[in-house]
């Protein structure tokens, strides 16, 4: 067909393109979901058991999408001793829109001012919770294209998930993840193995430009999420089976071939149901299911149709039970951030990846295939996979990325819990002020984590000014350094002390390529 390569053609790409480094940011305070149940007057366990949520992170009016992304980017650059001139592409995935024209990416360029690096491609990508994954694919495609200049790509996924008072509010959260993409990575994107499904649906959307709150069709949203998973998994299985056949292996792909399986997580219970859903797909596709012990007791469901089972409690219960061991082995650990911080929209699935990397050693991760299901309402979804490098030696890229996340649980534990009424007051404050001009935020600066960027003011022309809460390493800085405003050329951010040049030319050498709340 037009545009396709001949079967005998060889394409060349940089070697092992993938995730080189990962940084995650979440706010310094949370509300306990058990306490929120009491405050909301609902049955005990509705949020903690029914949704599977323990705590929900939130931010005051001191933080917005720009400050979240500035924080996670600068943290990644500093923790990895990177120079700002080693970034050649920067793209943001978000659905938290505070300006209909100016991108979050352009705000992030303030961090690059001192380096003088303005030659950075990419802008923002938006489709509910899928924008981060679309940005990741764009980054990979850039590195594997003739446009690549040998530098890293940086992807930022971040959101503030807030809901009006009611059943959906406990499925909120806040967070941002930054992913450094490049060759010779410890987490490698498997080429040709993406199963994508896109369709038109009004399951979750935000048409009101004056409100942060979405319009949600809860039942439709659950159906859309699960049906997209069915479609994506089916396409992925066909593609990897075709690859295996070329290698002389005719076995069918199943859940057992994933070392880990992570999901976009609006709430933890949906993720558990989703893994069970994948087992249902395996069951229906297995011509020898009677000989497989994992399907023992499921014989009665041999003739069900996938499209008839989205709300079938008997099917759901049976396959959740049958997949319980698989869930414990492959998915449960990925829910650390989701359970403790809530839904982070575009960054949710990458928070799940961070959770896995934080809880397993390089030796336990080496060689594993990580399945990744990304979903965004409206809708767009992809199931793809990462292959972990085999090199788990001390000082290896895999050792470095896991070491950088080893403090994830302690960081979550270091947050401050606040009473539900204080949380509600903050939500009301956001609702009343997020669109105001000539506004100075009321939230405490001292309560923020050190190194957090925050909103100083919004002027009469809606222009936003930010500052960074000092870190111990900032003691020698002059007072006022760290205050940035896009219209003041003299204000800047100090770059990391250690300068790292662009990727060496050798790295670019090619190698022959043979919910009831809305699940967005």
From Swiss-Prot:
Consequence when changing residue 129 to A/S: Loss of activity
First-listed, main subcellular location of the protein, grouped into a coarse class: cytoplasm
Phosphoserine, modified sites: 4, 495, 516
Subunit structure: Homodimer.
Record-listed Phosphothreonine modification sites: 476
CDD domains associated with the record: init_cond_enzymes
Segments for region (Disordered): 492-520
Family as reported in the entry's similarity comment: Belongs to the thiolase-like superfamily. HMG-CoA synthase family.
Subcellular location: Cytoplasm
S-adenosyl-L-methionine among keywords: no
Stated role: Catalyzes the condensation of acetyl-CoA with acetoacetyl-CoA to form HMG-CoA, which is converted by HMG-CoA reductase (HMGCR) into mevalonate, a precursor for cholesterol synthesis.
PROSITE patterns: HMG_COA_SYNTHASE
Gene Ontology MF terms: hydroxymethylglutaryl-CoA synthase activity; protein homodimerization activity
Keyword vocabulary terms for this entry: Acetylation, Cholesterol biosynthesis, Cholesterol metabolism, Cytoplasm, Lipid biosynthesis, Lipid metabolism, Phosphoprotein, Steroid biosynthesis, Steroid metabolism, Sterol biosynthesis, Sterol metabolism, Transferase
Name listed for the protein in its UniProt record: Hydroxymethylglutaryl-CoA synthase, cytoplasmic
Positions with a binding annotation for (3S)-3-hydroxy-3-methylglutaryl-CoA: 43-44, 129, 167, 171, 221, 264, 273, 343, 377
GO cellular component, one term: cytoplasm
SUPFAM superfamilies from the UniProt entry: Thiolase-like
Listed EC numbers: 2.3.3.10
Pathway(s) of this molecule: Metabolic intermediate biosynthesis; (R)-mevalonate biosynthesis; (R)-mevalonate from acetyl-CoA: step 2/3
Reaction it catalyzes: acetoacetyl-CoA + acetyl-CoA + H2O = (3S)-3-hydroxy-3-methylglutaryl-CoA + CoA + H(+)
GO BP terms, alphabetized: acetyl-CoA metabolic process; cholesterol biosynthetic process; farnesyl diphosphate biosynthetic process, mevalonate pathway; lipid metabolic process
Modified residues (N6-acetyllysine): 46, 273
């Amino acid at each position: 067909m037009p545009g396709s390569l001949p079967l005998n053609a060889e394409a060349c790409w940089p070697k092992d393109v993938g995730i080189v480094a990962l940084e995650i940011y979440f706010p310094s305070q949370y509300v306990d979901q058990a306490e929120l149940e009491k405050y909301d007057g609902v049955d005990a366990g509705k949020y903690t058991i029914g949704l599977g949520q323990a705590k929900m992170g939130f931010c005051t009016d001191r933080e917005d999408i720009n400050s979240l992304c500035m924080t996670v980017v600068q943290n990644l650059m500093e923790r990895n001793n990177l120079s700002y001139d080693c970034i050649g592409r920067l793209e943001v995935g978000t659905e938290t829109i505070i300006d209909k024209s100016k991108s979050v990416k352009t705000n992030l360029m303030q961090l690059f001012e001192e380096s003088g690096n303005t030659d950075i491609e990419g802008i923002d990508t938006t489709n509910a919770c899928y924008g981060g994954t679309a940005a990741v694919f764009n980054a990979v495609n850039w590195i594997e294209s003739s446009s690549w200049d040998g530098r890293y790509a940086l992807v930022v996924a971040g959101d503030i998930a807030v809901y009006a008072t009611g059943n959906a509010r406990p499925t909120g959260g806040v967070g941002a993840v930054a992913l450094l993409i490049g060759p010779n990575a410890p987490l490698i994107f498997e080429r040709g193995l993406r199963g994508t499904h896109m369709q038109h649906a009004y399951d979750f959307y935000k048409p009101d430009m004056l409100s942060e709150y979405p319009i949600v069709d809860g039942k439709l949203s659950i159906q859309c999420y699960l049906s997209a998973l069915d479609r994506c998994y089916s396409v992925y299985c066909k593609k990897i089976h075709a690859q295996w056949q070329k290698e002389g292996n005719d076995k069918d792909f199943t859940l057992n071939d994933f070392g880990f399986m992570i999901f976009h997580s609006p709430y933890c219970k949906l993720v558990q149901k989703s893994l069970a859903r994948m087992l249902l797909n395996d069951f229906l596709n297995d011509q020898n299911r009677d000989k497989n012990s994992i399907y023992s007791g499921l014989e009665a469901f041999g003739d069900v149709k996938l499209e008839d089972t989205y709300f079938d409690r008997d099917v759901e219960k049976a396959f959740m039970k049958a997949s319980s061991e698989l869930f414990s082995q492959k998915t449960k650990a990925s829910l650390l951030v989701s359970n403790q911080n809530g839904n982070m929209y575009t960054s949710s699935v990458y928070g799940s990846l961070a959770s896995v990397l934080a809880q397993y050693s390089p030796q336990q991760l080496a060689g594993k295939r990580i399945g990744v299901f990304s979903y965004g309402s409206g809708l767009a979804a992809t199931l793809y996979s990462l292959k972990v490098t085999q090199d788990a030696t001390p000082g290896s890229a895999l050792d470095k990325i896991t070491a950088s996340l080893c403090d994830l649980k302690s960081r979550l534990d270091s947050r401050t819990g606040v009473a539900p009424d204080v949380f509600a007051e903050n939500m009301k404050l956001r609702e009343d002020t997020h669109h105001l001009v000539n506004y100075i935020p009321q939230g405490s600066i001292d309560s923020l984590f050190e190194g957090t960027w925050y909103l100083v003011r919004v002027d009469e022309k809606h222009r936003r000014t930010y500052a960074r809460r000092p870190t111990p390493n900032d003691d020698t800085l002059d007072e006022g350094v760290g205050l940035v405003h896009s219209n003041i050329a003299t204000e800047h951010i100090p770059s990391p002390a250690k300068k790292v040049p662009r990727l060496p030319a050798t790295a670019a050498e090619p190698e022959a390529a043979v919910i009831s709340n809305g699940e967005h």
